[in-house]
Regions:
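Enzyme catalytic cores with a strong preference for nitrogen-chemistry domains
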Residues: 1-350, 358-371
Length: 371
C-alpha cells in the first residue's frame, strides 16, 4: 500500500463448462499474473470453478466433488501468495446446494459467502439448483478445516485497518436493498461481486450505472467480476464486463467480449475519511456480523491511477459550458437573496481588470436580471 492505495483486480478465465480441473488451471494462471502485477485483492466471476451455465449438472455429485477438490487446489496454490482471492464455487451445506463466493488468503479459506437473492425469472432459473443463503450461518468441512458459511461476514486486514472486504453475488446487487448496503454499514470499504450477468442490448450502460451508483451510495470501492468466454451460449451470452468503481467513479472497465483482466488502485484511506466526514453515514456494527481477519504485506507499488489536473473543469466542451453556467447560477442566486433581504436596488463593484472582478460583474448582472 502506498499513501492508502491498494491495487485490486477483476478477472474471469476462459472456462470450460463443468470442467473444474481445466478451469482451475486457468484460475491459477491469472492468480500468478495478477500477483506479479502487484494486485492485493483479486475477484473472479460467479461459479468460476464449475462455470455458471452447468444447468442440471449442478445436481450431479461427481461435479460437486470435483469442484471441492479443485477449490482445495486453489487454496494450496495461494499459500505463498500475498493477496486475497475471491472465487466462485458451488458448496453443499446440510444437503443443500449454495452458490458461493469463497474468500482465500495465504493458503487459508477465511470464509464462504452464499448468494442471498436467486433469480428465477426470464432466462434465469437458479432456484432449480440452488438454495438462498439468507439467514444461513453454518460450518462446513473443507479439507481438514471447518469454514463459516454465512452472508453476513466482513474480512478485515489487520495491518491495513481501512481495508475491510465483504461479498455479494450478482443478483444481490440488482434487488431494492442489496446485501452490500448492510456490509458497508458493518464497516466494509470494499465490496466484491462475483457475477454472471447476461448480455443484452443496452444492459452495459445500466450495469455500469448500477455498480458506480452503489459505490457512491456506500462510500466504498466496488469490484465487479463478470462471467465471460466459455460459458454456454444455449440461451444467453456473457461478455466479461468487469468494473472497478470507487465512490461513484469508474476506475477500470473491461472491454466486453475480450476476457480482459482489469486493475485499479483504490484509496481505502480516502474512503474511510469520507465516511468520517459524512456524519449521517452509520457507524459501528449493524446486526449480527462475523468478522474474519487476514493480513497483507504493505506493498509500495507504482500507482497507475491518474488524476485530472483541473478536477472541476470537464474536458468535454458541452459539459464545461454546463459547469460554468451552474457556477454562475449558484453565485447569482446567492447574491440575489442578499439583495432582496437588504432591499438593495444598486450594487457597486470595484473593477481591477482581473478575472475576479470580471466574474463579480457577471454575477452581479445576472443577479439583477433574476430580481
Amino acid at each position: 500500500m502506498k499513501d492508502g492505495f491498494i491495487k485490486v483486480a477483476a478477472a474471469t478465465p476462459k472456462i470450460k463448462v463443468a470442467d473444474p480441473a481445466y478451469n482451475t488451471e486457468e484460475i491459477l494462471k491469472i492468480i500468478d499474473e495478477t500477483e506479479k502485477k502487484g494486485a492485493s485483492v483479486l475477484v473472479f466471476s460467479e461459479l468460476t470453478i464449475s462455470g455458471y451455465t452447468c444447468g442440471d449438472l449442478f445436481l450431479q455429485q461427481p461435479l460437486l466433488t470435483e469442484c471441492k477438490n479443485q477449490l482445495l487446489r486453489i487454496v494450496k496454490a495461494t499459500k505463498k501468495k500475498d493477496m486475497l482471492v475471491v472465487v466462485g464455487c458451488p458448496i453443499i451445506v446440510n444437503q443443500k446446494l449454495y452458490n458461493c463466493a469463497v474468500v482465500i488468503n495465504r493458503g487459508e479459506i477465511l470464509g464462504i459467502v452464499p448468494k442471498t437473492h436467486l433469480p428465477n425469472y426470464s432466462e434465469f432459473y437458479e432456484l432449480r439448483h440452488f438454495t438462498s443463503g439468507e439467514g444461513l450461518d453454518e460450518m462446513v468441512m473443507i479439507g481438514d478445516e471447518y469454514i463459516t458459511v454465512c452472508a453476513n461476514q466482513v474480512f478485515t486486514c489487520e495491518n491495513i485497518p481501512e481495508l475491510v472486504i465483504a461479498c455479494e453475488i450478482c443478483e444481490d446487487l440488482w434487488v431494492p436493498l442489496p446485501p452490500s448496503t448492510y456490509h458497508a454499514m458493518a464497516g466494509a470499504t470494499v465490496i466484491c461481486n462475483p457475477s454472471a450477468s447476461v448480455e443484452t442490448t443496452t444492459k452495459e450502460s445500466y450495469r455500469r450505472s448500477l455498480v458506480s451508483n452503489q459505490s457512491a451510495r456506500l462510500l466504498a470501492a466496488y469490484i465487479y467480476a463478470d462471467a465471460g468466454e466459455g460459458e454456454s451460449t444455449q440461451d444467453v451470452v456473457y461478455s466479461g464486463h468487469h468494473l472497478i468503481c470507487e465512490n461513484g467513479s469508474v476506475l477500470a472497465e473491461a472491454k466486453r467480449f475480450t476476457n480482459e483482466i482489469v486493475y485499479a488502485d483504490i484509496d481505502v484511506q480516502k474512503l474511510a475519511a469520507e465516511r468520517r466526514k459524512m456524519t449521517s453515514f452509520p457507524g459501528g456494527k449493524v446486526g449480527d456480523y462475523i468478522e474474519q481477519t487476514f493480513s497483507l504485506k504493505i506493498k509500495e507499488n507504482k500507482i497507475t491511477r491518474t488524476f485530472p489536473k483541473a478536477p472541476f473543469v470537464p474536458d468535454n466542451q458541452d459539459e464545461r459550458d454546463k459547469r460554468c453556467d451552474e457556477i454562475l447560477s449558484l453565485q447569482s442566486m446567492g447574491l440575489k437573496k442578499r439583495l432582496e433581504h437588504t432591499n438593495c436596488k444598486h450594487a457597486v463593484v470595484g473593477i481591477s481588470g482581473g478575472l475576479d472582478s470580471t466574474l463579480a460583474v457577471l454575477v452581479t448582472a445576472r443577479a439583477f436580471d433574476l430580481l
